[in-house]
């Protein structure tokens, strides 16, 4: 085991040697990432003064997962897709104020973006966002009401217009056309992957960069990735659910678990699962895995995340005005 990681575990868990169980409530397409991180972390924990550790995972659309925690799902940590989903749990009194400052990089251990997956040979000739609204092109993406992928797909589409000098009226016209070409809205990212890759519905799938890699790997040459010239910068945060962790007696283990994500070991696992690590030296080692897409921040489309949620995804707001199931 890495000496630095060993020292980190000893310091963090000194005096906490007992069996511990954590529940990590995460967003939809992170199953494979967390299985690998958990396996490595549990092995390290077993060799430390911390004792035995079990980590359970729960996955679904990010906003739906946040609601589940607020409604009583006993998460010790949340690793959701979007800051407002995590902050909604804070507003419910379960996460302490200032949670973004508890871990490095604003509690964001990796970044990602939205890319396109197309059929073999790219028969629709899809290269950029305007191609998605060509007549006869069916687009698969999850619901912005329940899914982080869905929200980011919408914001990336909107931002693809305004980041290139288009007006908000132009962006509204574009997303109105786009969502008329979406035949079904699944509740989460993995459901949309199933719809596109297994049920073979649609011509292009808007999805997380990491999910696209996995989807194409499993498709046996039947699918391809198209990296658009520009897309949104996704910054999924992590946080301890303080009220639950305190009640469970898991605060130290939960904190160490999330701190592990920022170690070289954790960042390497993150990179190998096609999430963009935040440590520059780790990202540099995996540069070939991450195409040079111009990523615009969320502030390109709204003042902040709360503004984006209220403006685009609130009841009766922009998305509701353009999408009629």
Place the predicted regions along the sequence by residue.
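Sec-dependent signal peptide recognition
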Residues: 2-7
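Sec/Tat signal peptide C-region and signal peptidase I cleavage site
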Residues: 13-19
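N-terminal segment of the mature folded domain
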Residues: 19-147
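Ligand-binding cleft/hinge of the Venus flytrap
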Residues: 39-49, 130-195
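A bilobed periplasmic-binding-protein/Venus flytrap-type ligand-binding module shared by bacterial periplasmic
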Residues: 114-122, 235-252, 269-273
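Short helix-loop capping/hinge motifs at secondary-structure junctions, enriched
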Residues: 121-127, 146, 159-167, 244-252
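Ligand-binding pocket segment of bilobal, Venus flytrap-like solute-binding proteins
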Residues: 164-229, 237
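Extracellular/periplasmic juxtamembrane helices and adjacent flexible linkers that interface
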Residues: 245-325
């Amino acid at each position: 085991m890495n000496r630095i990681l060993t020292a980190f575990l000893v310091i963090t868990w000194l005096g906490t040697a007992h069996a511990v169980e954590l529940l990590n409530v995460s967003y939809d397409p992170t199953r494979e990432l967390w299985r690998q991180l958990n396996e490595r972390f549990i092995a390290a924990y077993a060799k430390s003064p911390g004792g035995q550790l079990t980590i359970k995972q729960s996955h679904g659309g990010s906003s739906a997962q946040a609601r589940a925690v607020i409604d009583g799902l006993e998460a010790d940590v949340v690793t959701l897709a979007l800051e407002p989903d995590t902050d909604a749990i804070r507003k419910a009194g379960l996460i302490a104020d200032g949670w973004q400052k508890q871990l490095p990089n604003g509690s964001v251990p990796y970044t990602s973006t939205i890319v396109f997956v197309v059929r073999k040979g790219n028969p629709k000739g899809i290269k950029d966002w305007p191609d998605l609204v060509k007549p006869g092109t069916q687009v698969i993406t999850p619901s912005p009401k329940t899914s982080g992928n869905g929200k980011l797909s919408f914001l990336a589409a909107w931002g693809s217009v305004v980041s290139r000098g288009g007006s908000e009226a132009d962006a509204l016209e574009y997303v109105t056309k786009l969502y008329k070409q979406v035949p079904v809205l699944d509740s989460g990212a993995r459901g949309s992957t199933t719809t596109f890759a297994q049920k073979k519905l649609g011509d292009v799938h808007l999805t997380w960069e990491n999910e696209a890699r996995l989807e194409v790997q499993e498709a046996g040459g039947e699918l391809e990735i198209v990296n658009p010239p520009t897309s949104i910068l996704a910054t999924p945060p992590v946080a301890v659910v303080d009220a639950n962790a305190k009640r469970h007696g898991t605060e130290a283990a939960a904190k160490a678990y999330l701190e592990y994500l920022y170690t070289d070991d954790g960042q390497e696992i993150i990179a190998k699962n096609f999430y963009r690590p935040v440590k520059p030296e780790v990202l540099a080692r995996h540069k070939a895995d991450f195409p040079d897409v111009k990523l615009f921040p969320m502030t390109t489309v709204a003042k902040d995340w709360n503004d984006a949620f209220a403006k685009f995804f609130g009841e009766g707001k922009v998305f509701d005005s353009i999408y009629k199931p």
